[in-house]
């Protein structure tokens, strides 16, 4: 059985090299939504950052530094261990915006000396929704299916996105096909 995982990242910039990943959350896509993972707050590892990125999540650089709990390497090793525990084979990465979230995770794993367990691909929830709804321009409507508030806490955001993905798959009789 392939394990599908929804991931959400918060960062202090638009991409690695222009900011640091602050923290991330993940949920296994399953009806119970019992298996979630919250990374520790990661020490800034890039001197460059965008104050607007911090403002968007209600944090400052000073608060980030003061609340940091782990190095990037420690955070990624913890996530890799959780993925190994929850996945028998290569997990599938899902996100609201994999162009953003996947790049941080993909940068984090090799920075920690770990191969990316997800490989080199990711799936975007909005594209699946638009395709199943047969409405190619409607890539945002799925966000109304979240039950957990989207508040820039990455665990809450990952859970809300997983809830929406499950609702989409149920509506189109695809959930059982995905999780078997």
Please state what every model-predicted region is.
Residues 8-10, 101, 124, 157:
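Acidic active-site catalytic centers that drive phospho-/nucleotidyl reactions
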Residues 1-99, 148:
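Conserved non-catalytic scaffold segment of RNase H-like nuclease domains
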Residues 17, 34, 67, 105-106, ...:
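Hydrophobic alpha-helical membrane-insertion segments
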Residues 42-59, 122-162:
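Active-site-proximal helix-loop-helix substrate-binding element of RNase H-like nuclease domains
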Residues 85-88, 111-114, 170, 174:
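Secondary-structure boundary motif
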Residues 92-98, 103-104, 108, 138-180:
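Acidic, Mg2+-coordinating catalytic module of metal-dependent nucleases/exonucleases
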Residues 83, 99-120:
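Substrate-recognition/cap helix-loop segment adjacent to the acidic, metal-dependent catalytic center
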